[in-house]
Swiss-Prot record:
GO terms for cellular component: cytosol; mitochondrial outer membrane; nucleus. This is Inclusion body clearance protein iml2. Inclusion body (IB) resident protein that interacts strongly with lipid droplet (LD) proteins. Involved in LD-mediated IB clearing after protein folding stress, probably by enabling access to the IBs of an LD-stored soluble sterol derivative that acts as a chaperone in inclusion clearing. The gene is iml2. Interacts with lipid droplet proteins.
Length: 691
């Protein structure tokens, strides 16, 4: 196989650069093994190579392990490897640019010499940024944002090259060699271009101040670049454009990196989006998803990672959010709803490509759960086969724990979350808390029926609850405590205070079913069938039943939680009028100061506003036409006017939730609010012409 160095520098293979197509092939073949749960094979295949591609591959392997498990030691290893990859790629990019005019130098039709190394650099920077933001150090998080900015500049430069290529290809004015040279000149990457090995490729004067960067709806040059180069998104891997594996690597990599960047930034909650807005970053979900779909077409490491990212997004985030854009058609261009057939085909492709991986089995389970097949979702995760990759095994057990929780299989739920404690150190306080909550449900079921069984579960719940608080705060995100750690510590402190005040055991001071409350936070009700939802209502009803001797002592806060969670169940049952009535009478009619104060659940207000908005969104005639549901409230009212009224009211509630002062779990609820406001904006844009 010919050396890339001989193409770049006009040298014979024997004396060429260490960078080669062989190295790129080893990156593709070896690093991809981790997606088949073969981490040892991935490490061994990349261990001896010294090229930038090998360095990147080692960084990718560590990064995947780090982001699957969130363990600090693995994150440190990933950070070190990615720094090496970034430095190596910068050096090789500099060499490629310096020798770009050597005799017989190979020129891509699309990209300037050294672009493949610029992409390696950008990929390393993006992965470093993610690791930095996940790091417990605020300093490392800030460094992560800076690396994100540098990666953006590089990726924008690559997209400008694609834009130039498509423009000239369409005009037919230049032959491929001339086109490459023209692209090189227009991007400022000729032989005379000065390059610092520590900085990324700079195309078309893109070295802007951070505050000037804008990846949003404004008609900037960057937008024009992406819009024009989007013509390439219609080209499949077998297109003549992608005859060279280097071009395949650059195109798929640039689409994946820029796509994931746009998608992730578009998803951040209001508090973080303000920070990103200040430094000039704004996301674009639709554009990002289209670029990820394009990257997933390619049969390489990048294609597989893009597929994993999208399956996680659609089966996790989309199914977590209740207010999402309406599907516009069954065409491939519609990416913001839930393109089920495309996702099923993509998952089948990945299962075939990686038959030994529990990771893709996990994604199949998530897809089943997202489509209300919780029993099948749980069954897929209860097999005997185990992943040799600890991080994948931890994910499998965690997902099994959640599914058991949604299905009200309390013993399995508790056992599985306790198993998570040994597999992952990210949020052990939460694992113990949910395990204890499951025993609260078993305790309440046994009350009045089996005293010894009730005592056993009460003791187990108490043990787990008291184990949880000391573990809270051990892990941090951007130097802040994890949201659920804060929640768990406060919640148990609240119950301990009530137990002391009421002179009752801790298990009797617990309020509204904590499992149902946790299902609400994970949006598990949207994954349930009618039978499962009816079971949830029965468990919630216990609070007001004669079996609960302490309900009369409860104040408006705990009663508000009951009405909020009950309303969420009713919404999932498509009983919107009942749900809205509970929210209005139980929460919105009260002064919000009732839910603010020491040990109080101050998330109730914003969560109730989001729930009201979700009901209104689901009452729209368009939503009912697509998803089914109850008959219209006012059949005589004009459908278009009814739709507009529902959207207007929905937006009002969302804006109130978005403006809410800081509260517990604001990042988690904020994710849903951000996605919802984007869906409303998309609806308004689509309907502005008919207003």
């Amino acid at each position: 196989m010919f050396k890339v160095g001989s193409w770049l520098y006009g040298k014979k293979p024997g004396t060429a650069s260490t960078q080669s197509l062989d190295s790129l092939t080893e990156l593709r073949d070896s690093a991809t093994l981790i997606l088949n749960d073969d981490v040892d094979g991935a490490e061994d295949g990349l261990s001896e190579g010294i090229s930038s591609f090998h360095n990147l591959g080692r960084g990718v392997v560590a990064f995947i392990r780090a982001t699957l498990g969130f363990e600090q030691e693995i994150m440190r290893q990933a950070s070190e490897r990615l720094n090496i990859a970034e430095t190596s790629a910068a050096s090789d990019q500099h060499k490629a640019q310096h020798n770009s005019h050597a005799p017989n130098t190979y020129h891509s039709q699309i990209y300037v010499p050294g672009t493949e190394f610029a992409l390696c650099q950008a990929m390393a920077q993006l992965m470093s940024a993610v690791v930095g933001v996940l790091n417990e150090s605020l300093t490392e998080s800030i460094k992560g944002f800076y690396k994100m900015r540098k990666a953006y500049i590089t990726l924008d430069g690559i997209l400008k090259m694609e834009q130039k290529f498509m423009q000239m290809k369409r005009s037919g004015e230049l032959s491929p060699p001339e086109l490459a040279q023209s692209s090189s000149r227009s991007s400022g990457q000729g032989a005379d271009a000065k390059s610092n090995p520590t900085t990324p490729v700079e195309a078309g004067g893109l070295s802007q101040k951070l505050s000037e960067l804008n990846v949003s709806r404004e008609p900037t040059d960057s937008d024009m670049s992406v819009e024009t180069s989007s013509e390439m998104l219609s080209h499949d891997p077998d297109s003549d454009i992608f005859r060279n594996q280097i071009d395949v690597f650059v195109h798929s990599g640039a689409n994946f990196c820029f796509g994931i960047l746009l998608l992730l930034i578009s998803m951040v909650p209001p508090a973080f989006s303000k920070l990103l807005g200040i430094i000039g970053f704004h996301g674009d979900k639709e554009r990002g998803l289209k670029m990820l779909w394009q990257a997933s077409k390619f049969h390489n490491l990048i294609g597989a990672i893009a597929a994993f990212a999208m399956l996680g997004y659609y089966n996790g985030f989309v199914r977590y959010c209740d207010i999402m854009p309406d599907p516009v058609s069954r065409e491939e261009g519609d990416v913001q709803a839930y393109p089920q057939e495309r996702l099923e085909a993509l998952l089948a492709k990945m299962r075939k490509q990686f038959p030994k991986s529990q990771l893709w089995l996990l994604e199949e389970s998530r897809m089943e759960g997202a489509n209300k097949n919780l029993e099948r979702a749980l069954e897929l995760l209860c097999g005997e086969e185990r992943s040799p990759l600890k991080q994948v095994e931890a994910l499998r057990v965690f997902e099994r724990s959640l599914n058991a929780m949604y299905l009200h299989r309390y013993q399995l739920c508790s056992e599985s979350f306790i198993e998570c404690v040994d597999l992952n150190s990210w949020s052990r306080s939460l694992y113990y808390y949910i395990a204890g909550a499951a025993h609260v449900s078993l305790y309440r079921s046994a009350l009045g029926k089996d005293a010894s069984e009730a005592t056993k579960h009460a003791e187990q719940a108490t043990e787990y609850f008291r184990t949880a608080p000391p573990l809270a705060g051990k892990k941090r995100f951007m130097a802040r405590q994890l949201p659920f750690d804060v929640f768990v510590a406060r919640k148990i402190a609240k119950w301990e205070a009530r137990a002391k005040e009421w002179k009752v055991p801790l298990v009797d001071a617990v309020g509204v079913d904590p499992i149902e409350e946790m299902i609400f936070f994970w949006n598990g009700h949207s994954r349930m069938t009618q039978a499962h939802l009816e079971e949830s209502l029965q468990h919630l009803a216990w609070s007001e039943s004669d079996a609960n001797k302490h309900w009369s002592r409860e104040g408006p806060e705990e009663k508000a939680i009951l009405q909020l969670v009950r309303a969420a169940v009713l919404r999932s049952m498509r009983k919107h009028s009942e749900a809205k009535d509970l929210l209005q009478r139980g929460i919105l009619d009260h002064d919000k100061s009732l839910f603010v104060g020491h040990l109080k659940d101050n998330w109730i207000g914003p969560a109730a506003h989001f729930e009201m908005a979700a009901n209104l969104w689901m009452e729209r005639p368009t939503y009912i036409e697509i998803h089914g549901g109850p008959d219209e409230e006012n059949p005589g009212e004009d459908a278009h006017q009814l739709e507009r009224n529902k959207v207007r009211q929905c937006k009002e509630y969302l804006e109130k939730a978005a403006r809410w002062e800081s509260y517990e779990l604001d990042a988690r609820i904020g994710l849903k609010v951000t996605a919802a406001l984007e869906a409303v904006h998309k609806w308004e844009t689509a309907h502005s012409a008919t207003s």
